[in-house]
């Protein structure tokens, strides 16, 4: 009989995309996969499109919100727990996988109430509130970065589940010896990167640099106009659909330090200048960036000290030192966990009794 797995993942791509990677491995192993999410998160669009049944919870995050939201939190969480309880009783899963974020809280708690094996996976180097709490009651605790949880949690480091296209970098290595710069302003647009990076690139001089810049929809026109004002040729897009191709094309990335970005850079062996989002909860992006920087795979530049002059100096230093780029690429690949999705799926199936 096929094992039944419920996945708890929602809100942002940082939770949803690694969960989809695991879901694909589970489905290929013959398991039935169901999803629990919200109607307002990314999962509402991409999970049904991937062919997975999804059930809805009425819940949202409360950290960083105002007093009014926090006052409503107990009632909201109570309702979400009741919804999760009904869903789990109807779906009858053999195991539940929580991928962090507010969606995982009610479903994870109700899984334990019903005696269903609970596995959690943390994508960041600093665990989020939900996973810190669930780690005390979960049957298995998995982490993307070694040491994310305290030793008492008994966590196993699996790495972050990668999209199938990113996994293919395991089988080929692209030499990073050119002058191709990939700028990732994020799906929502990172103002600091979109406004400072073009000006820094305009200061480089010397050999020409090929530029690709993902701006996010909100800042696309402004950034494109800025490149034109600076007389710089650049391929500017609101979104880059084929990230595998972009990673393979680039010799250097300039970007934020979300968990999946850091993991994909490592898998692609792509050297990077990382500018962590300074307002991320618990400053987890700085911790993520440190993981690559400490290994010599990236340069960390705090946004508080970022300006076009210092950034231009760093970009020039990297592009002019081909040996250093290659060393950074090798260091990144040494950190990669190409089998993370398979490892997480295997734990789920073990707990499900497969």
From Swiss-Prot:
SUPFAM superfamilies: UDP-Glycosyltransferase/glycogen phosphorylase. It holds the Pfam family Glyco_transf_28. One of its GO terms (biological process) is lipid glycosylation. Transmembrane segments: none annotated. It is an enzyme of class 2 (transferase). Its main location: membrane. GO terms for cellular component: plasma membrane. The keyword Cell cycle applies. Keywords: Cell cycle, Cell division, Cell inner membrane, Cell membrane, Cell shape, Cell wall biogenesis/degradation, Glycosyltransferase, Membrane, Peptidoglycan synthesis, Transferase. Cell wall formation. Catalyzes the transfer of a GlcNAc subunit on undecaprenyl-pyrophosphoryl-MurNAc-pentapeptide (lipid intermediate I) to form undecaprenyl-pyrophosphoryl-MurNAc-(pentapeptide)GlcNAc (lipid intermediate II). NCBIfam families: murG (TIGR01133). This is UDP-N-acetylglucosamine--N-acetylmuramyl-(pentapeptide) pyrophosphoryl-undecaprenol N-acetylglucosamine transferase. It comes from Methylococcus capsulatus (strain ATCC 33009 / NCIMB 11132 / Bath). The lineage of its organism: Bacteria, Pseudomonadati, Pseudomonadota, Gammaproteobacteria, Methylococcales. The gene is murG.
């Amino acid at each position: 009989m096929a094992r039944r797995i419920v996945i708890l993942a929602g809100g942002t791509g940082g939770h949803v995309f690694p969960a989809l990677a695991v879901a694909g491995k589970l489905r290929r192993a013959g398991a039935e996969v169901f999803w629990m999410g919200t109607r307002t998160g990314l999962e509402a669009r991409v999970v049904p499109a991937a062919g997975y049944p999804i059930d809805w919870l009425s819940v949202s995050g409360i950290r960083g919100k105002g007093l009014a939201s926090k006052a409503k939190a107990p009632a909201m969480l109570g309702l979400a727990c009741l919804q999760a309880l009904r869903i789990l009783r109807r779906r009858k899963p053999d195991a539940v996988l929580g991928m962090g974020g507010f969606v995982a809280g009610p479903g994870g708690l109700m899984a334990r109430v019903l005696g269903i094996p609970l596995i959690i996976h943390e994508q960041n180097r600093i665990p989020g509130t939900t996973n810190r709490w669930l780690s005390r009651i979960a049957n298995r605790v998995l982490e993307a970065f070694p040491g994310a949880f305290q030793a008492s949690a008994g966590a196993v480091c699996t790495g972050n589940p990668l999209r199938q296209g990113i996994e293919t970098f395991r089988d080929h290595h692209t030499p990073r010896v050119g002058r191709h710069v990939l700028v990732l302003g994020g799906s929502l647009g990172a103002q600091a990167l979109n406004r400072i990076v073009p000006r820094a690139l305009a200061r480089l001089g010397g050999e020409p640099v090929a530029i690709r810049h993902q701006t996010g929809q909100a800042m696309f026109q402004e950034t494109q106009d800025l490149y034109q004002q600076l007389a710089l040729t650049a391929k500017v897009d609101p979104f880059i659909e084929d990230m595998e191709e972009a990673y393979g094309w680039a010799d250097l990335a300039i970007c934020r330090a979300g968990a999946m970005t850091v993991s994909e850079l490592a898998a692609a062996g792509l050297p990077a200048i990382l500018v962590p989002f300074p307002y991320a909860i618990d400053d987890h992006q700085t911790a993520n960036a440190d993981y690559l920087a400490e290994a010599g795979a990236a340069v960390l530049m705090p946004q508080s000290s970022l300006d076009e002059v210092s950034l231009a100096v760093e970009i020039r230093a990297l592009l002019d030192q081909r040996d250093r780029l290659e060393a950074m690429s090798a260091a990144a690949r040494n950190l990669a966990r190409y089998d993370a999705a398979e490892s997480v799926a295997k734990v789920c199936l073990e707990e499900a009794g497969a």
